[in-house]
Curated annotation (Swiss-Prot):
Its main location: secreted. The lineage of its organism: Eukaryota, Metazoa, Ecdysozoa, Arthropoda, Chelicerata. Residues 2-66 form the LCN-type CS-alpha/beta domain. Alpha toxins bind voltage-independently at site-3 of sodium channels (Nav) and inhibit the inactivation of the activated channels, thereby blocking neuronal transmission. It is found in: Secreted. This is Sodium channel neurotoxin MeuNaTxalpha-10. GO terms for molecular function: sodium channel inhibitor activity; toxin activity. Disulfide bonds join C12-C65, C16-C38, C24-C48, C28-C50. The keyword Secreted applies. Belongs to the long (4 C-C) scorpion toxin superfamily. Sodium channel inhibitor family. Alpha subfamily.
Length: 67
């Protein structure tokens, strides 16, 4: 497991707009992470950051997000 921005297909983050919302924690825990929160103004903008996300779940990597 590792920490990171959980990625949708095509290397895009799960966008979020409220640091205090439970949205990201839900997305992360549903995918097997211990927890998660909304990282505001991070390297990829506002995106969900997961703690202890399983290795088989994709994370955002450098390169383009292909919407």
């Amino acid at each position: 497991a590792r920490d990171g921005y959980i990625a949708k297909p095509h290397n895009c983050v799960y966008e979020c707009f409220d640091a205090f919302s439970s949205y990201c924690n839900g997305v992360c825990t549903k995918n097997g992470a211990k927890s998660g929160y909304c990282q505001i103004l991070g390297i990829y903008g506002n995106g969900c950051w997961c703690i202890a996300l399983p290795d088989n779940v994709p994370i955002r990597i450098p390169g383009k997000c292909h919407r």
